[in-house]
Each structure stands twice: as C-alpha cells, then as structure tokens.
Amino acid sequence: MTKLHSVDFFPAQEVSVAIEPRLPQGAFPEHHHDFHEIVIVEHGTGIHVLNGQPYTISGGMVCFIRDSDRHMYEHTDNLNLTNVLYRSPDKFRFLAGLHQLLPQECNGHYPSHWRIDQHTLQQVRQLITRLEQVSAGQDLSTVANREILFMQLLVALRKNSLLEGDENTDARLNHLIAWLEDHFAEAVSWEAIADRFALSLRTLHRQLKQHTGLTPQRYLNRLRLVKARHLLRHSDDSVTHIAFSCGFADSNHFSTLFRREFGWSPREIRQGRDASLQ
C-alpha cells in the first residue's frame, strides 16, 4: 500500500495546513498518509472506500481522514475534490482543543462522512481560497491568520453539517441521502420518501439529480450495488443471498445491473478477477 508523506504536500515543515485540489479526481488505489485530511466533494460522484467500507460520495459531502486511516477512490464520474491537509492538532501554535471541532470516534463508530448544503459549500470555497492565498511564511501574524482561517473552516463545517440539523430543502435532501445509506436494502416508495422528508416528488427528483448526477432510482441502485460488491469481496454469502440482502428481488436482474455498473460479473468479483484494479 502506498504511503503519502507530508514533505511532498506541505511547503515547509512548520506549515500546519495545505490545500491540494483534485479537479478531477480519478480512481486512486488504496493508500494512507502521515497527515490528516478533510476532503470537500465539490461535485460529481464516486465511491470512497475508507478502511474497507464503501461510501457513495457526491457534491456537498465532506470526508474526514485520519493519519491512521487507509482509503481509496474508485468508479469516479466527473468527481471534483478539494483536499484540506493538516498536521496533528498538537502541531498548531495558537489553536487548542481543535479536536472538539472534528469527528470523534464513539463506541467503535467514527462519523467520517458529513454533508453540507450548497450555501455552506460556497462559504467553504471562499475560506479555502483565502487559505490558499496565505503565504508559507512563519511570522506570527501569518501563522495566526492561517490557523484562524482553518478554525473558521472547521466551525462552518460543523455548524452547517447534518450534526447540527436544519429545515431548509438542502438539509432535508441531505438527511434523505443519509437515510438511504442506512436503509438501501428496504423496498422504497419515492412518494413515501418524499413525504417523509417534506419534499415534493418533483423536488426530490430534481434536487437529487442536481446533487449526485443520478436519478433517484439510479442512485439507489448504485448504493445497493456498491454494498453488494463489498459483501462479495468480504463475505462467503452466496451471490443470490447477497442480491436479496442488498434490496434486489431478482438475482438475474442484479447480475445484469452489476456487470453494467462495474464491468465484471458478481462471480468474477468473488473470484478476485478485478484485484489488479483495486
């Protein structure tokens, strides 16, 4: 597995924050690094595999990667990211208690993927632009300015993420997407889902397509297929059992959609035929 080193991304040893845009981000094999990373998903879609667990990502998602994590990107479609790299929180000169603004692991669960609305995404872009404009200088005012902007970024992300809740349309759609991640295997009525999240059916279709580039059913199918592929690689369950457990009522239809999505049949994935691409 590749290890990325801070010396290749930070302009100086003393600089605590660096910006690394990926416009676009193609498929990238599993790797880890000796720094932390906040991934801002600008637009497009892809699959982010963090510590072996797949997540479908799209515009407005924020991913928090620790220096102890391993991750990779695959099956990307016009995926544009901005990576905010930062050193260990104890390396900051003026900021104390920084960890309180970051996701915290609790009972073995690490809430690594957040969602923000489009207004917050624009705020975040502006803060990142200002961070990019700060020089690599180490005089007190420059260091303080850099760290203040980074703290403002963390505050904006936390305040406007799903953790804090909101009632606008963007927030309701983000809650819907998070709900689908947890309930992908259930039979879905889009009319009932729209009612559940106080959206009109037309708004649901339009907004989900705008956020993910996919129709609602296509997005749900991709979620199911990604989860199924994970089980094919990491469990001994039969293909038929996996198809049913991921929400497909017909294993033949599942196999057809699977090959169309990934270019391999479920049995080929089970046999590790795609291993060279992982």
Swiss-Prot record:
HAMAP family: HTH_type_RhaS. CDD domains: cupin_RhaR_RhaS-like_N. Binds DNA as a dimer. Pfam families: AraC_binding, HTH_18. SUPFAM superfamilies: Homeodomain-like, Regulatory protein AraC. The lineage of its organism: Bacteria, Pseudomonadati, Pseudomonadota, Gammaproteobacteria, Enterobacterales. Residues 174-272 form the HTH araC/xylS-type domain. The record marks D250 as: Interaction with sigma-70. It is found in: Cytoplasm. GO terms for cellular component: cytoplasm. One of its GO terms (molecular function) is sequence-specific DNA binding. The keyword Protein biosynthesis does not apply. Activates expression of the rhaBAD and rhaT operons. NCBIfam families: PRK13503.1 (NF010028). This is HTH-type transcriptional activator RhaS. Keywords: Activator, Cytoplasm, DNA-binding, Repeat, Rhamnose metabolism, Transcription, Transcription regulation. Residues 191-212, 239-262 bind DNA. One of its GO terms (biological process) is rhamnose metabolic process.
